[in-house]
UniProtKB/Swiss-Prot annotation:
Its EC number is 2.3.1.48, 2.3.1.-. This is Histone acetyltransferase GCN5. Residues 1-28, 39-59 have a biased composition (Basic and acidic residues). Signal peptide: none annotated. The gene is GCN5.
Length: 439
């Protein structure tokens, strides 16, 4: 359980109130002021006290000095004489400016924490309309759950994550995750997840996150390092987390040596180190002058590619050029992708999203010899297995026909198959060049 005292320690504001105090990053993400430095800086910074924040932050990552322009949110560092820069998300800039904070709260009956939890409850209820409101309220206020909230000062909740830790089993279940609809373009979601990962690792022995994601959230969780491949043994989590119909179980394995709030800087440093290594075995970094043959546009003559400086050294061959000219995917791929996405998002699609579980339906594969589901179709599409639209339609028909073959006419599954097939047929008919494929 997180106490009010612990929460306050995790969000000390002292380092941001003095404009010239250099911040020292600690492992638990608490910012501490060095006494000697603070006293010196106070004397030197009297003419800047009205700025309300320091301008630059310097830290060392991987042996390189990284300088952050806090006001503009631009990170710079030099590696092997090359300057690298990247721009922080607006949410990071706002946090550095003291406009927002990330606070961990639970139901400890303190007035302020209860206000934050109520704000989170309201956002979850609005952003997750398919969830019963009473169910959301019960879990948010449940004392076995913790929440990390994004708070715009002084006390406006703009989003957050509610999770349940299972410390002895070394994983936590993310129950709800949402950002207010008016705040979803500022990078709060990614920054919030990074804060949560660092907080959980530094305050517990949790190494994994599990969550059930609906079709609209899968993309977000993939970007945050989650995968549909569950490596945790079922005996660890089965029966402990909530199972949602139509949801996709996803897992995130946290890396022990990474500070996720610095992930952007670390990746940039890795890129710089990789470029240095490439320069030792390749000449791809050398910039060569343009070809003289193209200076006179009225007298352009054919040229042997092998005589172009650097091209042969790069490993180019005529066969590679022919391969590059060949289209990687057919013109039907975009249409298939759109139809498949709409199928997956349809209200009647939930029984067909994943393969039928043999443990739950032991005799299914005795009757169905050519099983198919929407996730398998997605994998085939990503692997470029659909050479023509007819192949995709064939698999879709398998999904519907298999369902009707195994289930009786009066079952809900049979009716779901009919509904989804009708929707599928209409979508294909909307595309003129493929409408003739539907009877």
């Amino acid at each position: 359980m997180v106490t009010k005292h612990q929460i306050e320690e995790d969000h000390l504001d002292g380092a941001t109130t003095d404009p010239e105090v250099k911040r020292v990053k600690l492992e638990n993400n608490v910012e501490e002021i060095q006494p000697e430095q603070a006293e010196t800086n106070k004397q030197e910074g009297t003419d800047k006290e009205n700025k309300g924040k320091f301008e630059k932050e310097t830290e060392r990552i991987g042996g390189s000095e990284v300088v952050t322009d806090v006001e503009k949110g631009i990170v710079k560092f030099e590696f092997d004489g090359v300057e690298y820069t990247f721009k922080e998300r607006p949410s990071v800039v706002e946090e550095n400016e003291g406009k927002i904070e990330f606070r961990v709260v639970n139901n400890d009956n303190t007035k302020e924490n209860m206000m934050v939890l109520t704000g989170l409850k309201n956002i979850f209820q609005k952003q997750l309309p398919k969830m019963p409101k009473e169910y959301i309220a019960r879990l948010v206020y449940d004392r076995s759950h913790l929440s990390m909230a994004v708070i715009r000062k002084p006390l406006t909740v703009v989003g957050g994550i509610t999770y349940r830790p299972f410390d002895k089993r070394e994983f936590a279940e993310i129950v709800f995750c949402a950002i207010s609809s008016t705040e979803q373009v500022r990078g709060y979601g990614a920054h919030l997840m990074n804060h949560l990962k660092d907080y959980v690792r530094n305050t517990s022995n949790i190494k994994y996150f599990l969550t059930y994601a609906d079709n609209y959230a899968i993309g977000y969780f993939k970007k945050q390092g989650f995968t549909k491949e569950i490596t945790l043994d079922k005996s660890i989590w089965m029966g402990y987390i909530k199972d949602y119909e139509g949801g996709t179980l996803m897992q995130c394995s946290m890396l022990p040596r990474i500070r996720y709030l610095d992930a952007g800087k670390i990746l940039l440093l890795q890129e710089a180190a990789l470029r240095r290594k490439i320069r030792t075995i390749s000449k791809s970094h050398i910039v060569r002058p343009g070809l003289e043959q193209f200076k006179d546009l009225n007298n352009i003559k054919p040229i042997d590619p092998m005589t172009i400086p650097g091209l042969k050294e790069a490993g180019w061959t005529p066969e590679m050029d022919a391969l590059a000219q060949r289209p990687k995917r057919g013109p039907h791929d975009a249409a298939i992708q759109n139809i498949l996405t709409e199928l997956q998002n349809h209200a009647a699609a939930w029984p067909f999203l994943q393969p039928v579980n043999k443990e739950e339906v032991p005799d299914y594969y005795d009757f169905i010899k050519e099983p198919m589901d929407l996730s398998t179709m997605e994998i085939k599409l990503e692997s470029n297995k659909y050479q023509k639209m007819e192949d995709f339609i064939y698999d879709a028909r398998l999904v519907f026909n298999n369902c009707r073959m195994y289930n009786g006419e009066n079952t809900s599954y049979y009716k779901y198959a009919n509904r989804l097939e009708k929707f599928f047929n209409n979508k294909v008919k909307e595309i003129p060049e493929y409408s003739h494929l539907i009877d």
